[in-house]
Each structure stands twice: as structure tokens, then as C-alpha cells.
């Protein structure tokens, strides 16, 4: 039995990582057999719209700030934002996330409330960054949403590998380098000047 002493989200992340590492170790030692031809799908729904950031002392969006709350939970945005479920969803296959998406907020008043009252973004910042969107919503935007799938993850599962680097034609290294194209390559001073970028190389 394992115990984790931390905040709920951090404890879950630690124990989840421990579960995966333990399974990998047992498999390596021949104590556990993982079948790659047994497909177990799972939809993750109803997870919190907001998470509390202790460092910033405020709520942050669990998925993104445009995710719509579950209708019957919307009233809790004022009193208990952490209890509000979001209309976001992930599809998982054999423990690997294949895709995720959400239903978006389409009412200007609700979006403004999320920005200013819950996320504590100053009104002037909201107006400068998202004013165009809030105005567009006043013309009657319909409910909308979507989902994005990771085809590379699907192929990795079909091939029985745990790393998408094994199935990508030109995978990058952990440092973001493309070994085939030898990129990234150094940029010239002229290119940096055109983009008004100054670099400071550590000694």
C-alpha cells in the first residue's frame, strides 16, 4: 500500500507515475505480461473546470479558459469554482491519451465572468486580448466544440511501442533537434535584427 502526502492533484500525479513505472519494471523482470492486442477504451469526462494554483493564489483553467461549464454547475462559479465540472473530454486507449476536446463558451456574459471574476484577469487585459471575441459573441454565436486526435499515438499503440518517436518519420530529440535535417541551424545577425531579437549566450 502506498500513501502520498501532498495536495490532491500532486498526489494523484505522483501515484499515477509510480503506477506506470512499477508496471514497466515488473514487465521488464518478467513478472507482468502486457497484452498489446487487448484494446481498452476510456472516455474521461466531468473533470473540474478550474484548478487552484497555490503559487499564484488564484484559480486557473484546467483545460483552457474557453471551456464551457456543465450547465447545472454554472451557478457555482461565484461560490465554489473548484466544484464546477467542465464540458471537456479525453479519449484514452490502454492508458494513452488519443485525443481531447471541449464544448466552448458562446455567451459573452459567461465568458467575461470566467475571465474577470474567476480567473482574475483585469478587465482592460480582457478587452485588449479578447474584446473582439466577446463582441462577436453578441451577434449570436452558436454552441460549438470539437476534438483533436493524435494519429501518431494511435500508430504507436498499433505498433506496440510506448514512444511516438518510434513511429514518426522525422522525430526530434529531447532537445528539439532534427538529426536528419541538422536543425535548428544558427541564425544570422541580420535575421535577428529583422525580428528585433537579442540573444545573450551564457558564458
Give residue ranges: language-model regions:
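Structured aminoacyl-transfer and RNA-binding surfaces used for tRNA recognition/handling
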Residues: 1-203
Amino acid at each position: 500500500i502506498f500513501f502520498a502526502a501532498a495536495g490532491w492533484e500532486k498526489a494523484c500525479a505522483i501515484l499515477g507515475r509510480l503506477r506506470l513505472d512499477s508496471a514497466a519494471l515488473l514487465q521488464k523482470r518478467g513478472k507482468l505480461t502486457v497484452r498489446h492486442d487487448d484494446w481498452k477504451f476510456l472516455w474521461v469526462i466531468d473533470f473540474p473546470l478550474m484548478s487552484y494554483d497555490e503559487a499564484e493564489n488564484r484559480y486557473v483553467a484546467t483545460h483552457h479558459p474557453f471551456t464551457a461549464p456543465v450547465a447545472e454547475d454554472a451557478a457555482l462559479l461565484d461560490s465554489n469554482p473548484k466544484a464546477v465540472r467542465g464540458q471537456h473530454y479525453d479519449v484514452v486507449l490502454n492508458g494513452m491519451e488519443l485525443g481531447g476536446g471541449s464544448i466552448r463558451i458562446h455567451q459573452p456574459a459567461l465568458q467575461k465572468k470566467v475571465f474577470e471574476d474567476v480567473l482574475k484577469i483585469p478587465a482592460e487585459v480582457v478587452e485588449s486580448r479578447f474584446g473582439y471575441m466577446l463582441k462577436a459573441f453578441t451577434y449570436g454565436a452558436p454552441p460549438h466544440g470539437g476534438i483533436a486526435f493524435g494519429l501518431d499515438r494511435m500508430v504507436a499503440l498499433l505498433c506496440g511501442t510506448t514512444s511516438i518517436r518510434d513511429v514518426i518519420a522525422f522525430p526530434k530529440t529531447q532537445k528539439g533537434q532534427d538529426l536528419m535535417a541538422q536543425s535548428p541551424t544558427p541564425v544570422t545577425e541580420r535575421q535577428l535584427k529583422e525580428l528585433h531579437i537579442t540573444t545573450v549566450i551564457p558564458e
